[in-house]
């Protein structure tokens, strides 16, 4: 190589660097094809170093070569777009291959291939129909704005600058990508010009042009679709597509599923059918209440035996005992009078009303005592109950029946031992609990009194009481049954014990069931005001009370619920109720 050739070689190399900014070979060959050593690019004659260099570096158009003058300064003729089988974006030689390192190997590797990709995007690579990347895709114009690209950009040589921005390649059935990238088979991409996108949304099929094209995964019901509503195919995953069952815009559910709910809605809205349905519902509610009462009776009978109906109770004070002397003392005690005073203070009832309420409790006590006298087999029943309690218990079970003391304030059973009872009396929990329970009884007493007076049968009794007649006197058998039922209702308010009193009384209670439910509903109101949680807490424990000073409030709650509902149906006509409500 003489001085002139050496000078030409260095000049060509410098010129190449100035034009291209890169000093490495780009591809499988410039003008001559895949191999640069055989001189296919020359037009004849002996190859000189100048021609070799010019051909090798794509500088024929600068050094006077005739073949490459039609190409721009930044690109040589590139036959790669028409070639197939190889990776089209890979050069003919690796960066470390010896053939490439002959000329420019010392300069290679300084620039990344992303520069080449940026040049290739303007070079008409897609004009041959075999491109892997659209020249102007929506991702290049507005990257990250609408990422609805198909698999044409999933290639590792796409325009994504970071691997983290590249969506994961998915199969033909995943995330709605088409089975084959359309741009690979010659179809053109109209993303940049507002045409239908070939990219993937998060739903199935093509994105559509904002409502003009429906996605194949959506089933549109044209028969039931309203005329004034336009169907908009919104982007969303399959979960969202199945979500709107009653939205007006485009039903995404199957036709039979859509038609059935519409019929149901139309039937429910028809005024002619609402009345019978309401009647049926009311009947069901009444039956449910009575069934609930029966279950409560059975539950109480299982827990406490049939004798629990023979207990004497005071509905206002939640007092419960099996001894007549105890109830007599209670009705004459100061605690009972304090409760009545509290009721009068809160409700502002007249003295006549308070006397009537007291007489109601006395009448209940008398009725219970009469029932006990009529029960001849009470002792036998108790023995049978005792046998049932210990049924199935063997010596190996190490169980025995003992007496216990029930504390309604704490809802605790205490062994009937002096030491245990004294220890509980001095415990801080009992000291706090008895104060809270006392306040609770006062609150519930007001609600119980109001619910009793809301009972229409009790109102009739009160009218007779005001006239000076005996309100509890039995005039007719039917009236007597109603009265007994009412009294039982009152007792139910306090405890469902009296609901279960006798089979005859249960029948009477069913006849007067609505009245009983009214009282029960009223007591439920009490529970709601005071907090049903508290009432329930007092509930079962109170009913079980062996020592028998407090009635169970738990059963009262259920009765109160029924009474509340009945009370709503029957407004309070009782003249004394108005001050209560105020």
From Swiss-Prot:
Residues 1-124 are annotated as: Mediates transcriptional activation. It is found in: Nucleus matrix. A motif (Bipartite nuclear localization signal) lies at residues 238-260. The modification N6-acetyllysine is found at residue 247. There is a cross-link at residues 140, 240, 247, 254, 264, 401, 459, 467 (Glycyl lysine isopeptide (Lys-Gly) (interchain with G-Cter in SUMO2)). The modification Phosphoserine is found at residues 48, 56, 63, 69, 81-82, 91, 106, 114, 118, 121, 137, 212, 249, 270. A zinc finger (C2H2 AKAP95-type) spans 314-336, 407-430. GO terms for molecular function: DNA binding; RNA binding; RNA polymerase II complex binding; zinc ion binding. The modification Omega-N-methylarginine is found at residues 173, 235. InterPro entries: AKAP95, ZF_C2H2_AKAP95. The keyword Nucleotide-binding does not apply. Residues 530-545 have a biased composition (Gly residues). Residues 154-194, 243-302, 472-582 are annotated as: Disordered. Residues 272-290 have a biased composition (Basic and acidic residues). GO terms for cellular component: DBIRD complex; intracellular membrane-bounded organelle; nuclear matrix; nucleoplasm; nucleus. Residues 483-523, 552-567 have a biased composition (Acidic residues). Keywords: Acetylation, Activator, DNA-binding, Isopeptide bond, Metal-binding, Methylation, mRNA processing, mRNA splicing, Nucleus, Phosphoprotein, Repeat, Transcription, Transcription regulation, Ubl conjugation, Zinc, Zinc-finger. Coiled coil: none annotated. The modification Phosphothreonine is found at residue 251. The keyword Transcription applies. Pfam families: AKAP95 (PF04988). Belongs to the AKAP95 family. Core component of the DBIRD complex, a multiprotein complex that acts at the interface between core mRNP particles and RNA polymerase II (RNAPII) and integrates transcript elongation with the regulation of alternative splicing: the DBIRD complex affects local transcript elongation rates and alternative splicing of a large set of exons embedded in (A + T)-rich DNA regions. May play a role in neuronal differentiation and is able to bind DNA and activate expression in vitro. This is DBIRD complex subunit ZNF326. It comes from Homo sapiens.
């Amino acid at each position: 190589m003489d001085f002139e050739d050496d000078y030409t070689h260095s000049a060509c190399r410098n010129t190449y660097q100035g034009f291209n900014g890169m000093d490495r070979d780009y591809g499988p060959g410039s003008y001559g094809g895949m191999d640069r050593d055989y001189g296919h690019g020359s037009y004849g004659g002996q190859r000189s170093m100048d021609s070799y260099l010019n051909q090798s570096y794509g500088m024929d158009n600068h050094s006077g070569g005739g073949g490459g003058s039609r190409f721009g300064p930044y690109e040589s003729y590139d036959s790669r777009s028409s070639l197939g089988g190889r990776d089209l974006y890979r050069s003919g030689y690796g960066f470390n291959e010896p053939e490439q390192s002959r000329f420019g190997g010392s300069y290679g590797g300084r620039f990344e291939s992303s520069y080449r990709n940026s040049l290739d995007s303007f070079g008409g690579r897609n004009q041959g129909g075999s491109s892997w990347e659209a020249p102007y895709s929506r991702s290049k114009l507005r990257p990250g704005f609408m990422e609805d690209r198909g698999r044409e950009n999933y290639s590792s040589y796409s325009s994504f600058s970071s691997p983290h921005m590249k969506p994961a390649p998915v199969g033909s059935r995943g995330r709605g990508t088409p089975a084959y990238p359309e741009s690979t088979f010659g179809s053109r991409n109209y993303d940049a010009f507002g045409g239908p996108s070939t990219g993937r949304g998060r739903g199935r099929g093509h994105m559509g042009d904002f409502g003009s094209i429906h996605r194949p995964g959506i089933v549109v019901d044209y028969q039931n679709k309203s005329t004034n509503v336009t169907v908009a195919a919104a982007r969303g995953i399959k979960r969202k597509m199945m979500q709107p069952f009653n939205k007006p815009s485009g039903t995404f559910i199957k036709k039979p599923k859509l038609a059935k709910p519409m019929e149901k809605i139309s039937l429910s809205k028809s005024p002619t059918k609402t009345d019978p349905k309401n009647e049926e519902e009311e009947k069901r509610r009444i039956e449910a209440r009575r069934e609930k009462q029966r279950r409560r009776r059975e539950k109480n009978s299982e827990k406490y035996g049939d004798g629990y109906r023979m207990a004497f109770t005071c509905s206002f004070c939640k007092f419960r005992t099996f001894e007549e002397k105890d109830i007599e003392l209670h009705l004459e005690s100061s605690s009972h009078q304090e409760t009545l005073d509290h009721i009068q203070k809160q409700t502002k009832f007249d003295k006549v009303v308070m006397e009537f309420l007291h007489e109601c409790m006395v009448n209940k006590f008398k009725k219970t005592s009469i029932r006990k006298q009529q029960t001849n087999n009470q002792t036998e029943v108790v023995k049978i109950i005792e046998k049932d309690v210990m049924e199935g218990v063997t010596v190996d079970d190490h169980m025995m029946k003992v007496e216990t003391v029930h504390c309604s304030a704490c809802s605790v059973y205490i062994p009937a031992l002096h030491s245990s009872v004294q220890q509980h009396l001095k415990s801080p929990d009992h000291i706090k609990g008895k104060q809270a329970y006392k306040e609770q009884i006062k609150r519930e007493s007001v609600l119980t009194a109001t619910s009793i007076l809301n009972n229409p049968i009790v109102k009739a009794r009160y009218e007779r009481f005001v006239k000076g007649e005996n309100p509890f006197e039995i005039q007719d058998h039917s009236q007597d049954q109603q009265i007994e039922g009412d009294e039982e209702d009152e007792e139910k308010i306090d405890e469902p014990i009296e609901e279960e009193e006798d089979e005859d009384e249960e029948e009477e209670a069913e006849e007067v069931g609505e009245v009983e439910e009214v009282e029960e509903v009223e007591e439920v109101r009490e529970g709601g005001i005071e907090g049903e949680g508290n009432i329930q807490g007092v509930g079962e424990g109170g009913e079980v009370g062996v020592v028998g000073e407090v009635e169970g409030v738990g059963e009262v709650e259920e009765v109160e619920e029924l009474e509340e509902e009945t009370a709503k149906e029957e407004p309070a006509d009782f003249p004394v109720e108005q001050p209560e409500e105020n």
